[in-house]
């Protein structure tokens, strides 16, 4: 796991980001959009938190801002919080990245959310124009330039496919942990060692 940290003590805030070499460029056509769907499942139930409702409640109590983005070659997640909550946010990142449950009761509604996102984008003429241009420019593998995904593959997705993505890409030698803000270098590297040292390495998928 590559760990990057940047100190800035001007305000008592920290941001923790996990960047994973994943995204549409890593997907075969039959999995197009599943990196995006996986991103939507990241802030759900895991080993430490029973369900998404409890997850959001805990985050809200601590005033943690969070978000995620799926691009062609990277999926990244972040938490921003006050510096006293650093360890708690690091624990959240560890449990979400390493121990997701992929609860089927949470998976189906989230799959519908992603399908709705695809439908909304495809109803936009500018998105459709860009999609058609991509299909012609990258005619052999156009799906690799479409991180949003397509309706057919997302509709057919299962929790087993989420596990497949996790096993291929969510490994320490395919990820980077970036921590910035009101932190100390030594503290971050020590904490990363404590929380992520036993994360099993795997052979990276050759895409």
Model regions and ranges:
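Acidic/histidine-enriched alpha-helical segments
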Residues: 101-119, 184, 203-207
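M16/MPP (pitrilysin/insulinase) zinc-metallopeptidase core fold and M16-derived inactive scaffolds
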Residues: 15-80, 123, 144-148
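Short acidic/His-enriched helical or mixed secondary-structure segments at domain edges of catalytic enzymes
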Residues: 60, 113-132
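Mature N-terminal segment immediately following signal peptide/propeptide cleavage
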Residues: 1-17
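An aromatic/glycine/proline-enriched structural segment found at the starts
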Residues: 139-140, 147, 171-172, 176-207
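Solvent-exposed, polar/charged alpha-helical surfaces in well-ordered, non-transmembrane soluble domains
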Residues: 32, 53, 57, 87, ...
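Buried hydrophobic packing residues in well-ordered domains
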Residues: 18, 36-37, 59, 77, ...
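M16/insulysin-pitrilysin zinc metalloprotease superfamily fold
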Residues: 44-48, 80-111
């Amino acid at each position: 796991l590559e760990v990057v940290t940047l100190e800035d003590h001007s305000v008592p805030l920290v941001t923790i980001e996990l960047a994973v070499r994943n995204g549409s460029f890593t997907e075969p056509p039959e999995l197009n959009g599943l990196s995006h769907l996986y991103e939507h499942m990241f802030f759900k139930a895991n080993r430490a938190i029973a369900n998404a409702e409890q997850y959001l409640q805990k985050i809200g109590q601590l005033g943690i801002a969070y978000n995620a983005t799926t691009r062609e070659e990277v999926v990244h997640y972040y938490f921003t919080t006050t510096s006293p909550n650093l360890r708690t946010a690091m624990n959240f990142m560890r449990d979400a990245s390493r121990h997701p449950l992929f609860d089927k009761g949470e998976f189906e509604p989230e799959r519908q959310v992603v399908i709705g996102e695809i439908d909304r984008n495809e109803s936009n003429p500018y998105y459709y124009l860009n999609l058609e241009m991509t299909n012609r420019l990258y005619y052999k593998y156009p799906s690799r330039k479409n991180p949003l995904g397509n309706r057919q593959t997302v509709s057919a997705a299962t929790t087993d496919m989420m596990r497949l993505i996790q096993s291929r890409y969510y490994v320490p030698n395919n990820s980077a942990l970036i921590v910035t803000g009101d932190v100390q270098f030594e503290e971050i590297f020590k904490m990363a060692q404590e929380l992520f040292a036993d994360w099993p390495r795997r052979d990276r998928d050759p895409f």
